[in-house]
Regions:
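Residues at the start of alpha-helices and the adjacent loop-to-helix junctions
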Residues: 4-7, 17, 141
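Bacterial N-terminal signal peptides that target proteins for export
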Residues: 1-10, 235
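Cyclophilin-like peptidyl-prolyl cis-trans isomerases
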Residues: 21-238, 249, 253
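Bacterial N-terminal signal peptides
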Residues: 10-18, 243-246
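Short alpha-helical segments used as structural interaction elements across diverse proteins
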Residues: 4, 247-249
């Protein structure tokens, strides 16, 4: 075996070990330009979804992304786009879609993956945080949305503050939460600055134990889908302008 082969195997093994270690991480800290919050990941019960999320974390792809959608009393959504001094938002590079793991209910303070309509196994990078108990809706749409983490009640203060920000519609994007930006600014078509958007500055692992979710009182999915994972219909839709590729959850009246 030559030196190049040995080196290649060693590098591959090191990468595998790093990935395996990261898969055990169960608490991450998300730092935004308006505050920090932690997500306790359910790696023991939704391993595929958690590993997918951590792959984006380890690659730094969530750093610099923005909260691109906010619907009061429903969800805030992120993990898909960056702002480069002007609209439209730019989509981040995504990995292959993952299998659906709808084990837990979409109750307040849980984090779940967004996905395409009529396709249960289409989640990639985008996620959303439930602002209310949305199980009656999101547990049944599109074979259920995969909840893979939870935010503490204390840290939800940061999430609620984001949800309380005014929202604006722009070409290609609706319900964009902004700070230090007014309706008059929008009427005057004032250009957005980076500081106006809610930006995720970093996502880092802060607790690498594999069982930190064991003490949580998790709520099972209220309507588990059939084993075939057949979709019951349009849970998500593209926004009006397709080039953004923005995933959108449907809120029922």
């Amino acid at each position: 075996m030559n030196k190049k082969t040995v080196k290649a195997i060693a590098c591959a093994a090191a990468g595998w070990l790093a990935s395996a270690g990261l898969a055990q991480a169960t608490i991450v800290e998300v730092t935004t330009n308006v505050g920090k919050f932690e997500i306790n990941l359910f790696d023991e019960t939704t391993p595929v979804t958690v590993q997918n999320f951590l792959n984006y974390v380890s690659a730094g792809r969530y750093d610099g992304t923005v909260i691109h959608r906010s619907v009061p009393g429903f969800v805030i959504q992120g993990g898909g786009f960056t702002f480069d001094q002007q609209l439209p938002l730019k989509a981040i590079s995504t990995n292959a879609a993952i299998v659906n793991e709808p084990k837990w209910s979409n109750v307040r303070a849980t984090v779940a993956m967004a996905k395409l309509p009529n396709n249960p196994n289409s989640a990639t990078s985008q996620w959303f945080i439930n602002l209310a108990n949305n199980g009656a809706n999101l547990d049944v749409q599109n074979s259920g949305f995969s909840v893979f983490g939870q935010i503490s009640s204390a840290d939800m203060a940061v999430i609620d503050a984001i949800a309380a920000l005014p929202r604006y519609n722009f070409p290609g994007i609706d319900d964009l939460p902004l700070r230090n930006y007014s309706s008059s600014d929008r009427d005057d078509n004032k250009p957005l600055a980076a500081d106006n958007l809610i930006t995720i500055e970093s996502v880092v692992v802060v607790d690498a134990r594999s069982n930190t979710a064991a003490a949580l009182s998790l709520v099972p999915n209220s309507a588990p889908p059939p084993a075939s994972n057949d979709s019951a219909g349009g849970s998500l839709s593209w926004l009006t302008l397709l080039p953004l590729g923005l995933l959108l959850l449907r809120r029922r009246a």
